[in-house]
Structures are given as structure tokens and as C-alpha cells.
Amino acid sequence: MSNCAIVGINWGDEGKGRMVDLLTEDYNVVVRYQGGGNAGHTVINEYGKFALHLLPSGIFRRNVVNVLGNGVALDAENLLGEIRDVTGKGVKITPENLKISERASLLLPWHRDLDALEEARLKDRKYGSTKQGIAPFYSDKYQKKTVLAGELFYPDELREHLRELMEWKNLIVSGVYGAPAYTMAMLDEWLDKFGYAIRPFVCDTAGYLREAQASGKNIMFEAQLGSLRDLDYGIYPYTTSSNTTAAFAPIGSGLSSLKLDSIVGIVKAYSTCVGEGPFVCEMFGEEAEKLRQAGAEYGAKTGRPRRVGPLDIVATRYGVQVQASTEIALTKLDVLGYMESIPVCTHYELDGKMTDSFPFPTLLAKARPVLERFEGWNCDISGIRKWEDLPQSARNYVTYIEEHIGCPIKYVSVGPERDSIIIR
């Protein structure tokens, strides 16, 4: 039996989906335990290219059971759209290989609307939300103002619960934002079209996972986003509204006794960021555009150009510590092949002093990157599958990162396809 978490070390978009898709060959169950439809996990395999926002990335493996845990922001509309897209490419999805926790809270129609209304109100002070309703959803969850997926089996009680929530929510929608109020007819339409359609997948997933654990199954826990977007440990308030750490896996999955055997932290070979907030190493102009195009750095959910920069050792080391990673997968090393020399941020300059410690969020806006340049390899490495076949300069780059973030790099990704990987 093995329990493994796949987590992001930086701002998200590190390549968690492609690593889950690769490593699930050795696992029986994959669990998404937090987050919602606000970030995408890109997977390229024999079925095609996919950007998964809610479906666990193990959905392409025939013998893997995929679970959406109680910690997930369950967006029925987006989930059904993903199921259609994936099954349309020949992937089989049934209640046997996709299970939704009866204790997962439903993302309701007003959550997405309120997200957009608040971003519009904030104007130039906005957080850069993907407008998928995540912050309003989690706010309501902690106010106990959401609907559990299990309530879908009790339509009469559910409608009464929704009516109470609607009356309360309309005070905000109309009273604060001046937007049109919701009606029960609108909610009935939403239930008929989306809510009830996911009922076949809803079950006691915590009970299922306990049985899987007791029978010696290998279970993988797939996180969304990364350490620097964690609600408690990220760059607050430019975070997501859930905990993106491996430590949340027991709570968000329903396996309270869970002990993780390994925590694989995913690190991109350079830095990217979607959304607002301090980004110490940010590149601009032509230099940034070259890197963005080389790495196809556009948001999987929004299509927005990602902010890009050199690898930030200070932020990455902090992310490794937050996640307590046991090993690292370094992704997109091949993207840097066009550079003659490769910049790396080794320290920050803050108030005239050098530091290699990640500062408190308030201070980050004043931090400046201290860069060191490494020799590039200036060639295509996407066909290489053995560590010793990499150019010496590429190996030097990887070992430098390994030594300075304090965690062994076991996997080196040299392309987006499943087999474009070097295992050390």
C-alpha cells in the first residue's frame, strides 16, 4: 500500500496533471481533495490533449478509480462539460471509475456571478480571479450556506434549503451589487440541467477510500494550484480560497487517518504566474514574450498570457518547505533550450540587504531579484530519456536547483507527452 500526494510548489501551472497521468500507472485510486474549476491540469496522452479543471487526472487509466473529495468546490456545470469532452474522445466514465463525495458542497449559480461582480467593483484593486466562483463558494461554505451533493437525493428538502439560501443571497446580489435577483424557477432549471445529472456519481467516498486503504490499494492525492496560492501559507491575499498543501489531503478526502508515504512536489524549470500580486522575478517585454511563446504559457482555464520569469530559488525553497516534499519533478526543462545563458533568482534584495528567506507578504512588493546566470545547452533535449544523455550544462542546472531547494529531483520532464520523462 502506498499513499502519495502530487502538489504544486510555486504559483500553480507547474505540470501536476502530466505527472499524475504518468505516475497513476502504479496507483489504483486518484483523489482530488481541494479546489474547483478555477485552474486546469493539462494532460497529453493517446486520447489527445486535455485541460482538466475538476476531473482527476487519473481518469484516462482504465483500472483507476477517480474520486472528488469533500474538500472540492463541486461545479456540476463545468464537471458535466468535462465529462462530455473526455468521453467524446473515447474515454469511458461511469460511476465505477468516477465517484463524488456526498459531502462535497455544490458551487451554485450565484457564486460565479458574485465573483465577477466583485472583481468589477474592485477595478484596479482586483485579485485576478478566474471568475469561477471559488472565493464566494468557500466563503459560503464556512458560513454553512452551501448545499451538499448528498442533498440531491432529497429533492423536496433540497428545494426548501435552496429557497432559504436564495432569499439570503438575493440581499447581497441585489442589495450590494444591484444585480437581478434569483428566482426558484432559475434554480429549478439549474437543478434539472446540471445538479440531478451528477447524482449517479455521488456516494460515500470516505467509506470507499477507507475500504480501499484497508485492502492495500495504492492511493494518489492530486492537489490544485501551488504553495504560493495556499490560503494560509501563500502570498495573501493573492491566494486561492482553499488549502493547496499535502497536509490538507486527509481533511479534503475524508481519510482522517491518512499518512502520506511520499509527497512529490512539481516545479517548473522557470517561473510562471496567473493573476495579480507580487511576482519578484517577473520578466517583461521581448524577453518575457520569447519565454511565454516557447513554453506556451497561457492559462488552461482563461487563456490569459501567464506572467513569466526565471526560476525563483527563494520562493521554490519556501514552497518545498510548506509542502514537506520528499521528492521533486522538474518540468519543462526542454523549454529553456533556446537560451544561451539561463537566469536564476538566487536571493532577494530587501531594504538594501540580501536574503534567501521568503519574506512576509507585505514585504514582497519591495523585494528585488538577485540573478545568477548559468550556461545554456542551446539544443533540443525533448528526445532524451536518460539522465547521462543530457548535456552537461542541463545536468548542472538541475543539480544546482536540487542542492539549493533542499529536495532531490527524481523526475525531469523534457516534453508534454506522457513518456517525455527522465527518471533519475
Which residues are covered by each model-predicted region?
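Non-transmembrane, aqueous-exposed alpha-helical and coiled segments at domain scale
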Residues: M1-R424
